[in-house]
Amino acid sequence: VLERAITKLNKNMKADKTLGKQVALLERVKVWLETGKCVRAMELDDEEKEIISSMDLLTYKPVIYVANVSEDEVASEDNEYVSKVSEFASTEGAGCVKICAEIEAEMAALEDDERELFLEDLGIEESGLDKLIKASYSLLNLISYLTAGEPEVRAWTITKGTKAPQAAGKIHTDFEKGFIRAETIAYDKLIECGGSLVKAREQGLIRSEGK
């Protein structure tokens, strides 16, 4: 991919001298890759990042390293191999999540209340899968918001910082076009009210979000 791009840019440089900076950058990236390193570990300025992003290079994409451990070690913080994976991930500016696939498989067959008791018995506050999902959302700059009604409660995934009209558009394009305002509440606050919007409204926790 890089070699083709460099060749094409070199040909076009005769007509556009401003492409020289791009060629120099891609040459630098090519040398970096030949040393066996990932592009995401390179130090790049904002302009260079924008250029590289357009290349769709696999080793520039954000990653999370997942360390699979045994059930006996899932609650321990002293696993030598997890430490090594975490140290390697940090060289790329990446995160590391520890899970026990065996435990996750067992929990998949349990009801929600049974899962909580299962985790308590193991001395774990949060499942590895939940940690991985949260880390993935953070890495991709995503959040979820919930809509609730008589038929169902549903989660919608949006990019962090998305405005209310565009968030509504995730449900249906008509909602974005005709958006006036939405009533919202933080999830934790709603849970504190026992899931009751009436109680939340009485406590002044409902916010009205306009455009």
Where are these regions (language model features)?
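C-terminal-of-GTPase-core extension/linker across diverse P-loop GTPases
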Residues: 3-211
